[in-house]
């Protein structure tokens, strides 16, 4: 028998749920669900808008992953990328196969074109937003909180850009959110499988697994010690039995699927050899001081070292003289300022709120932030690991949740909430990649 998960724990505390209400999705009865559908539709339309532009250009790391997919499919590819790679096998051994395989599958169906490259990212970006809304609604029992958090996430630039380019990160995030939602729904073993799929897209999915493990133990501890059931003993044998089952499903499914994909599409006969290669490759990615687009993790909280993914400049001439240059397209790896500059204060407030009233969703926000972001600090300080700002993508939803809690917990006038939402839209518009109609 499985433990109740986020949903059951929230009900046990009597704070995060209103007698089971708000768990479903019914736009006909819940106006917040209806408003979310509008936000979702706008987000989807913006991801699809000019998806094939700029023509003939690969954006940022698409140079690698699109060409990897071409190699997997046996198609002609850029000779600068894995020039000696045998066709039919994934030459990009530093990451697991799954996300690259999904890109290749899309290209097999839709063709070697921008729609084939990017449609899976559009799907997973949209899926991530929908799962995030359902997750927040389920763990908090509050549709207004879920709507505001989803609005903030939808109009974050980093989330938007990675939800429409053929890179691995949004696949990892999508499966991670699926794992969180399944856990919150009480389907724990399916949650472990989803988090294994997240890790098989990119190793950062491991942080999502850590979030669930730590949350499960801490929430049981607080329910027993401070959630209205003072004196209740913690059932440690049951907790460790749950940990054993959850970990076995996560590890076994991950290793078995890795072995299958490695044998069919990568060229490894032993998944542990592949895991050893990934470990050695990652360990070697070091530099004493960051260079170029590399950055320290603490710089991400200030949106520093933004990454120019792709810029198309327009030159203006007058009488054969260059008088002005401006970007017509500028894809940038950076967060919406209205999100990132509130990250630290909102997470601190969420931690304070949990200390005060033990709401489960505030604990999740804090752990989500801490376990997907803070591990980069020792990696940077002690290991001199090379890092990039877009590693923060897994943490962006946690910040959106924390900001929404910070705002709504003050019970401000609606005009204040509206003003913040307008400011988020202004920040999104300011960073929107297409500066003019292509």
Model segments located where?
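Transmembrane-helix motifs of polytopic, lipid-linked glycan transferases
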Residues: 115, 119-140, 178, 345-353
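Membrane-interface transmembrane helices that cradle and orient dolichyl/undecaprenyl
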Residues: 137-140, 177-190, 198, 220-225, ...
């Amino acid at each position: 028998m499985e433990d109740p998960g986020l949903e059951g724990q929230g009900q046990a505390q009597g704070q995060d749920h209103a007698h089971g209400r708000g768990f479903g999705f019914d736009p006909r009865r819940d106006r917040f669900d209806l408003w979310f559908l509008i936000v979702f539709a706008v987000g989807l339309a913006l991801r699809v808008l000019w998806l094939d532009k700029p023509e003939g250009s690969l954006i940022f790391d698409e140079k690698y992953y699109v060409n990897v997919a071409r190699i997997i499919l046996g198609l002609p590819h850029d000779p600068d990328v894995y020039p000696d790679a045998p066709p039919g096998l994934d030459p990009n051994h530093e990451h697991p196969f799954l996300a690259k395989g999904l890109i290749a599958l899309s290209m097999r169906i839709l063709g070697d074109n921008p729609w084939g490259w990017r449609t899976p990212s559009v799907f997973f970006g949209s899926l991530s937003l929908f799962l995030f809304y359902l997750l927040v609604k389920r763990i908090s029992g509050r549709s207004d909180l879920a709507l505001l958090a989803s609005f903030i996430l939808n109009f974050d630039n980093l989330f938007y850009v990675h939800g429409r380019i053929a890179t691995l990160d949004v696949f990892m995030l999508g499966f991670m959110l699926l794992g969180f939602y399944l856990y919150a729904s009480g389907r724990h073993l399916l949650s472990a499988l989803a988090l294994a799929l997240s890790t098989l897209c990119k190793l950062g999915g491991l942080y999502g697994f850590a979030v669930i493990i730590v949350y499960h133990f801490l929430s049981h501890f607080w329910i027993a010690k401070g959630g209205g059931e003072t004196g209740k003993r913690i059932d440690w044998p049951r907790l460790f039995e749950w940990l054993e089952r959850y970990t076995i499903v996560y590890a076994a499914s991950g290793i078995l699927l890795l072995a299958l994909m490695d044998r069919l599409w990568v060229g490894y006969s032993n998944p542990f050899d592949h895991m050893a290669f990934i470990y050695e490759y990652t360990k070697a990615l070091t530099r004493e001081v960051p260079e170029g687009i590399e950055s320290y993790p603490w710089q991400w909280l200030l949106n520093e070292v933004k990454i120019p993914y792709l810029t198309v400049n327009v030159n203006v001439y007058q009488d054969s003289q260059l008088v002005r240059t401006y970007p017509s397209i500028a894809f940038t790896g950076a967060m919406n300022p209205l999100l990132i500059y509130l990250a630290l204060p909102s997470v601190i407030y969420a931690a304070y709120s949990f200390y005060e009233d033990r709401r489960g969703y505030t604990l999740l926000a804090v752990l989500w932030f801490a376990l997907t972001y803070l591990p980069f600090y020792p990696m940077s300080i002690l290991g001199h690991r090379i890092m990039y700002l877009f590693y923060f993508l897994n943490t962006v939803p946690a910040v959106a949740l924390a900001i929404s809690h910070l705002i709504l917990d003050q019970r401000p006038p609606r005009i204040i909430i509206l003003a913040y939402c307008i400011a988020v839209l202004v920040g999104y518009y300011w960073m929107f990649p297409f500066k003019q109609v292509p």
